From Swiss-Prot:
Specifically dimethylates two adjacent adenosines (A1518 and A1519) in the loop of a conserved hairpin near the 3'-end of 16S rRNA in the 30S particle. May play a critical role in biogenesis of 30S subunits. The lineage of its organism: Bacteria, Pseudomonadati, Pseudomonadota, Betaproteobacteria, Nitrosomonadales. GO terms for molecular function: 16S rRNA (adenine(1518)-N(6)/adenine(1519)-N(6))-dimethyltransferase activity; RNA binding. It comes from Nitrosospira multiformis (strain ATCC 25196 / NCIMB 11849 / C 71). NCBIfam families: ksgA. Pfam families: RrnaAD. This is Ribosomal RNA small subunit methyltransferase A.
């Protein structure tokens, strides 16, 4: 059955066998692992994973691909969850979950935020993403790539770029390079669960106007005196602050607000 990649689903199918081998090697799957693949496409990664795993879950939104997968693989070995990964409850698959996928570039950032909600259920995640997105994920403070995505993910995950994948490894070839990233949940997230919403608001406000200084972007949260107490220069920009400093701001503001 031929399948034409659909632009609305951001489909760029992995077709390079060496890249598949490299991803499987990075995963080092064990037979008993609980693993879910997001966007399996034509099964380039699905097939070799099943050679190592007793069972695999996949989440796929394209009904033609769902039909293809159900015809090609035994339901005893492969469970196909038809639907949008952005709405999927990954906690329903159990604990110590391993997640892998060649993520559609058009939903990669919201999907990463969605998956961040399930850190208590995750063992690790390995994703193929646009190289520029991976650069932002792993970026350090005071660099051009460091931003909201860096802070929001690094407060929950230890992340590492593993290798680059060129466009010719896909069909159709994307216009950008890709990279594979490994994400391992921190044993203890840097921000308390009760503070996550406030933390996200503060980080978003700080990076809303990158060229403006903190005194302007965080004026709804901090006064000049607050900066002195925190030991933070209010003339810095959002990209100059470390994640621990954003955590400190959040905890401080919450204490002041609570009286």
């Amino acid at each position: 059955m031929q399948h034409t990649p659909r632009r609305r689903f951001g489909q760029n199918f992995l077709v390079d066998s060496q890249t598949v081998t490299d991803i499987v090697h990075a995963l080092h799957p064990r037979r008993e692992d609980v693993m879910v693949e997001i966007g399996p496409g034509l099964g380039a990664l699905t097939q070799p994973l099943l050679q190592s795993l007793e069972h695999l879950h996949v989440v796929e939104i394209d009904r033609d691909i769902v039909k293809r997968l159900r015809n090609e693989f035994s339901a005893k070995r492969l469970t196909v969850h038809e639907g949008d990964a952005l709405e999927f409850d990954f906690s329903s698959l159990g604990e110590s979950l391993r997640v892998v996928g060649n993520l559609p570039y058009n939903i990669s950032t919201p999907l990463l935020f969605h998956l961040s909600r399930f850190t208590d259920h995750l063992r690790d995640m390995h994703f193929m993403l646009q190289k520029e997105v991976v650069a932002r994920m792993v970026a350090k403070p005071s660099t051009s790539d460091y931003g909201r995505l860096s802070v929001m993910l690094q407060c929950r995950f230890e992340m590492e770029q593993l290798f680059i994948v060129p466009p010719e490894c896909f069909h159709p070839p994307p216009k950008v390079q890709s990279a594979v990233v490994r994400m391992i949940p921190l044993k203890k997230p840097l921000i308390e669960a009760s503070q996550e919403k406030l933390f996200a608001e503060i980080v978003s406000a700080a990076f809303s106007q990158r060229r403006k200084i903190l005194r302007n972007t965080l004026r709804d949260y901090l006064t000049g005196e607050d900066y002195l107490k925190l030991g933070i220069d209010s003339n810095l920009r959002a990209e100059n602050l470390s994640i621990t400093q954003y955590v400190a701001i959040t905890n401080y503001f919450n204490r002041v607000r609570s009286g």
